[in-house]
Amino acid sequence: MLDSKQLRTELQVVADRLATRGFSLDVARIESLEERRKSVQTRTEQLQAERNARSKSIGQAKAKGEDIAPLMADVERMANELAEGKTELDGIQAELDAILLTIPNLPDASVPVGASEEENVEVRRWGTPATFDFEIKDHVALGEISRGLDFEAAAKLSGARFAVLRGPIARLHRALAQFMINLHTGEHGYEEHYTPYLVQAPALQGTGQLPKFEEDLFKISREGEADFYLIPTAEVSLTNLVAGEIIDAKQLPIKLVAHTPCFRSEAGASGRDTRGMIRQHQFDKVEMVQVVEPSKSMEALEGLTANAERVLQLLELPYRVLALCTGDMGFGAVKTYDLEVWVPSQDKYREISSCSNCGDFQARRMQARWRNPETGKPELVHTLNGSGLAVGRTLVAVLENYQQADGSIRVPEVLKPYMGGVEVIR
């Protein structure tokens, strides 16, 4: 969440910056709550001073043998008024906190201003899309030829937006995940983690999915116990490992990676990408998370993005990098790069990774801090996350970019060690 002090002292500046994201901040409501808060706080402080003075008078009156009953009654009355004032203050603060939980992060000054994905800025491209001298098939048709992708069987089990993978295609999917994990742990310095796929509400609030995006989540209600949610990304479980911690400066940067299934309701995706594996309720992803000193987070974002790019480069898949505009960034991001891989059947680039610097937005929600050696005081860390990569979409890209005229698939060179000698999937 945003810094409440910044919201109070720079309210209009914050509102103007949020407006570039298409978010309308209710300035009047916040000003009204802040005025009430100040008024009640001033009143309670004055009352506390009066109560302290009256309490002192009781001792003096008692020493003189005077009747202290009226003074005692006054002190008791003031104590009751103070309790009421505290309750009122707590209520006002709860309202302000509830508002804060719905406000997105402030975009960095380097983020291009724009209203939608149409105004994202291309930063660079890598590789050249292949030309085919035969009619291109999409990954669904290629999966049917090898009997490796079965959407009908998945629908029988679970309904729409699921897939069953078989044989060499299932092995290729596993190979991709293993390759990604090995690359990030072996060359990029991440520590592999295995985390729960079910989390409770505080974890999702910590990374920003709750309360605003509950409809995008799969919830498991339990009578008499805290609800569970299926993770929409390992960002939730990995980032929350530092919740409530004060981290020694020598431990930073912390670089974590995990391969997990991800679960999303796709509540706002009705009618989009209904064919194939591009948009599913359950998909695998290799997620990278970094926890860093605030002064180093923008540099870390460039490194995180490069780590994701390296996967595509080694797979020899053409891609481009976009700097997302203010109106297209995720809720918790200060700055985001999207990686889009070339999908031949669609004749366009499709998102395969999103790499974001969240600044201290998540850290403030989680109270994740580091001890600054210069001040000796705990300060909020900065957190970053990025897909390295979405495994299902990478599988789609490999199937389509490595297809041959007869519908067979060449196995990328870098994946052959994971495929037990299989070089072509038929």
UniProtKB/Swiss-Prot annotation:
Quaternary structure, from the entry? Homodimer. The tRNA molecule binds across the dimer.
Positions of region (Disordered): 37-63
Looking up InterPro entries in the UniProt record yields: aa-tRNA-synt_IIb (IPR002314), aa-tRNA-synth_II (IPR006195), aa-tRNA-synth_II/BPL/LPL (IPR045864), Ser-tRNA-ligase_type_1 (IPR002317), Ser-tRNA-synth_1_N (IPR015866), SerRS_1_N_sf (IPR042103), SerRS_core (IPR033729), tRNA-bd_arm (IPR010978)
Where does the sequence pass through the membrane? none
Superkingdom, natural source: Bacteria
Q: Please state where this protein is localized.
A: Cytoplasm
Task: Tell me what this protein is called.
Answer: Serine--tRNA ligase
Query: Which terms under GO biological process does the entry name?
Result: selenocysteine biosynthetic process; seryl-tRNA aminoacylation
* Pfam families, per the entry: Seryl_tRNA_N, tRNA-synt_2b
Domain writeup: Consists of two distinct domains, a catalytic core and a N-terminal extension that is involved in tRNA binding.
Homology family: Belongs to the class-II aminoacyl-tRNA synthetase family. Type-1 seryl-tRNA synthetase subfamily.
